[in-house]
């Protein structure tokens, strides 16, 4: 069985589906940063990097927070909670589920 080449060194999932999902989340974070929507995403990236995190790790932190928001919205069938997302970004590197 061939090992699948990973497209992103930021995402290192164990399964192809997990890899695709992780890459989609990273792409969403990249879009938020590029579009400055919300601007707090870029600010969080810059803050984490200023604290000594690599860009990859900072992106992983932000992606974790976005993943939680997506999961909560799907699980509870509720809209995206921007206030909670921004609060969780502000609290990084402390993760919401720790």
Predicted regions span which residues?
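Structure-specific DNA junction-binding interface
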Residues: 1-98
